[in-house]
Structures are given as structure tokens and as C-alpha cells.
A protein has these predicted regions:
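Divalent metal-coordination and catalytic microenvironments
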Residues: 19, 45, 67, 79, ...
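Short, conserved clusters of charged catalytic residues that mark active-site
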Residues: 24, 62, 96
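A general structural signal for well-ordered alpha-helical segments in protein cores
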Residues: 25, 64-67, 128-129
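Short, histidine-centered active-site or binding-site loop motifs used for metal coordination
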Residues: 45-48, 83-86, 117-119
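Glycine-rich phosphate-binding loop and adjoining beta1-alpha1-beta2 segment
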Residues: 47-79
Length: 179
């Protein structure tokens, strides 16, 4: 099936930062695109980091530009970037984040949502997961039938194992032949 032949599946990838979508499930996004699925990527935080030399408005614009370039390479036609403060989603009222996510869920009407694992070390990743879990809770006429959490390399594996929140994947997507 080519991208021109739509499969009817609608996929939302909702992440905290620019690049999380690629690190977490870039190959899976590409596979969905090639299967004819419509994929939306929603980025919540502005991408400014606390690392020296990587902050400020210029860095934010560069991260957004890089996110758009990555979306173009993957074939993603729908990209939304919000400007919640990076590494400070825990300072934002959770309800504000949930409302943004719920608005996207209403607009996209996805059957599947991909996001961060709840036990990730990064607070923004955990907060994003929490907001999505709330926004995608089962309700009558709710479109989301599957929510999948991914590992974010360089973040998830640094978390100390804590039983139920340890990342233990049970869903795998074979991307070995995905161009």
C-alpha cells in the first residue's frame, strides 16, 4: 500500500520535546506512513534545554525547524509544536496540558496514540504520559482504542528500576525492512 492509498488508520504521536518522536518511534512512524496511515506528531514543550549553549529563543526555533525537517523526512504531514517550558512541565498545571492533548484528540480522532513511558527519568516525559493517559481514558464514543508507550533512549534507561514503572516492552514493531 502506498501513502496515496489511505488505510483509514489515524495515529497520534504526542511527545514532550522535539526529537522525542524520532528517538522513541521514528521507524514506527515511517512504517505507519508507508502503510497509508495518517500520522500526526504533537510536541508539547519548546525544546529549550538546560544544557549550556543550547538555550534561548534561537535554540527553540532551531529545534522546531529540526522537528519539521524530521517530519518531512518521515513523511509526516501534520506537525503541531506547542511552547510549554522545557524541563518544567511539572510546574504547569496538569489540567492545562490535558486540555491541549484533549483538543488534539478531538481534532485528530486517532485510534492509536504513542507517547513516553510512565517510568521515564525525564519529568516532562512522565508528565506528558500522565496527561495523555488522562485525555485518552475510555469514554463513550472515544476514538482511542490503543495507547502505546515507547522507550526514549538516553532517558528511559537511566531511571532506577522501580517495579511497576520499569520499562518492560510487550509490543514490538518490526521496522527492519522499513526504508
Amino acid at each position: 500500500m502506498t501513502p496515496a492509498q489511505k488505510s483509514g488508520r489515524r495515529i497520534a504521536v504526542i511527545v514532550a520535546h522535539p526529537d522525542d518522536e524520532v528517538l522513541g518511534c521514528g521507524g514506527t512512524i515511517r512504517r505507519h506512513i508507508l502503510a497509508g496511515d495518517e500520522v500526526w506528531v504533537v510536541i508539547l514543550a519548546d525544546g529549550e534545554t538546560s544544557r549550556e549553549g543550547t538555550s534561548g529563543d534561537k535554540a527553540v526555533v532551531e529545534r522546531e525547524t529540526a522537528a519539521q525537517a524530521a517530519a518531512n523526512i518521515l513523511g509526516v504531514q501534520h506537525l503541531a509544536v506547542h511552547r510549554f517550558a522545557d524541563n518544567r512541565l511539572d510546574a504547569e498545571p496538569l489540567l492545562h496540558i490535558i486540555r491541549v492533548v484533549e483538543q488534539h484528540i478531538r481534532e485528530i480522532s486517532p485510534d492509536t496514540v504513542y507517547t513516553h513511558h510512565a517510568g521515564d527519568l525525564n519529568i516532562d516525559h512522565r508528565r506528558t504520559h500522565e496527561a495523555i493517559l488522562t485525555a485518552c481514558r475510555p469514554q463513550l464514543s472515544h476514538p482511542v482504542t490503543r495507547m502505546l508507550a515507547f522507550e526514549t533512549p538516553s532517558s528511559t534507561e537511566w531511571q532506577q528500576p522501580s517495579g511497576v514503572l520499569s520499562f518492560s516492552p510487550n509490543w514490538f514493531v518490526d521496522i527492519s525492512s522499513t526504508p
